[in-house]
Amino acid sequence: MLQQIYDFLNINYNVSRETFNKFKEYYSLLSKWNSTINLVSATTLQNFWQRHIFDSIQLLNYIHNKDIIVADLGSGAGFPGVVLSISGIKNVILIESDSRKAAFLLQVAQLSDQKIEIINDRIQNLKVKCDIVTVRALANLSTILSHTKQFTVKDKYLILKGKNYQHEITQALLHNKFNYRLYKSCTDDSSWILEIKI
């Protein structure tokens, strides 16, 4: 089973054996911490590779240069931000308002060889400069755009969304101007990757 997972990651995302071992360590840390602060649901923890690693790493398909700054909003358990960092993104900013989750992020960030900054604060309190914003399971699109209006985003937003994506886009367009593209998620038929450029 693990060999098949490694082969998939290696073929599709050039994941080395060393990086794969870091993902295994990630799972161990997450399992340990999850019993006390509920970072992810027990069901998705059982499906760690597809639900969390594959779901996060697929964003690399839409990131064409690893020497960038990615700001990950509401990082929680570190998906997708920490996964992208372990996979080689040079600079990742993890923004998490819950201090217990920020403490977990501080520990799991040590698995990465790249630069990770953890900010324990609310998104709307910050002025962040980055190339790409990533978001997974945080808030509706209108809220995300409202909370980041003071950010300087050079390239785009990459947002993992579920089946209500079209309603969220329609609502957000009432108060915001942006161009968007939709890409099918490789992990769930009802999930999408929403790419937004403002």
UniProtKB/Swiss-Prot annotation:
SUPFAM superfamilies: S-adenosyl-L-methionine-dependent methyltransferases (SSF53335)
Keywords: Cytoplasm, Methyltransferase, rRNA processing, S-adenosyl-L-methionine, Transferase
GO cellular component: cytosol
Main EC class the enzyme belongs to: transferase
Domain of life the protein comes from: Bacteria
Entry EC number(s): 2.1.1.170
Cited Gene3D superfamilies: Vaccinia Virus protein VP39 (3.40.50.150)
Subcellular location as annotated: Cytoplasm
Molecular function (Gene Ontology), one example: rRNA (guanine-N7-)-methyltransferase activity
Residue numbers binding S-adenosyl-L-methionine: G74, F79, I123, Q124, R136
Alphabetical list of InterPro entries matching this protein: rRNA_ssu_MeTfrase_G (IPR003682), SAM-dependent_MTases_sf (IPR029063)
Catalytic activity: guanosine(527) in 16S rRNA + S-adenosyl-L-methionine = N(7)-methylguanosine(527) in 16S rRNA + S-adenosyl-L-homocysteine
Function: Specifically methylates the N7 position of guanine in position 527 of 16S rRNA.
PANTHER family linked to this entry: S-ADENOSYL-L-METHIONINE-DEPENDENT METHYLTRANSFERASES SUPERFAMILY PROTEIN
Protein family (similarity comment): Belongs to the methyltransferase superfamily. RNA methyltransferase RsmG family.
NCBIfam families linked: rsmG_gidB
Protein name: Ribosomal RNA small subunit methyltransferase G
Source organism of this protein record: Orientia tsutsugamushi (strain Ikeda) (Rickettsia tsutsugamushi)
This protein's encoding gene: rsmG
